[in-house]
From Swiss-Prot:
The keyword Transmembrane does not apply. Keywords: Cytoplasm, Hydrolase. SUPFAM superfamilies: Urease, beta-subunit. This is Urease subunit beta. The keyword Cytoplasm applies. GO terms for cellular component: urease complex. Coiled coil: none annotated. Residues 106-133 are annotated as: Disordered. It comes from Staphylococcus epidermidis (strain ATCC 35984 / DSM 28319 / BCRC 17069 / CCUG 31568 / BM 3577 / RP62A). It is an enzyme of class 3 (hydrolase). Pathway: Nitrogen metabolism; urea degradation; CO(2) and NH(3) from urea (urease route): step 1/1. It holds the Pfam family Urease_beta. The lineage of its organism: Bacteria, Bacillati, Bacillota, Bacilli, Bacillales.
Amino acid sequence: MIPGEIIVKNTEIEVNKHHPETVIEVKNTGDRPIQVGSHFHFFEANKALEFDREKAYGKHLDIPAGAAVRFEPGDEKKVQLVEYSGRRKIYGFRGLVDGDIDEERVFRPNDSNQNAAVKNDAGEDNANKKGGK
């Protein structure tokens, strides 16, 4: 062992385990690349990103902290979102919430809407899980 060395288990890291997921289709209609970070309130993402914003209210990307998803001009891809946890307050970003999340606006997936939600993590099929690309 080397002084200061950290030895960890060689296992997969589970991100946002037991958080219900919502999958939405996103298209960059702008002329420049757009990146959205792991903790950004997706509802408030760049206006050039076209998607069902109401389904994104109160949610962020289901990716590891510090990662991001990049949308090149014209890109269209599915992303997986999860609800914020903790105190459920959102401040900053584009200033559209600045306080408590309005629970009545939060889309919660159910079995009757298979296009908006998945029961289990989509793993490698999920665009956001591919190294932030």
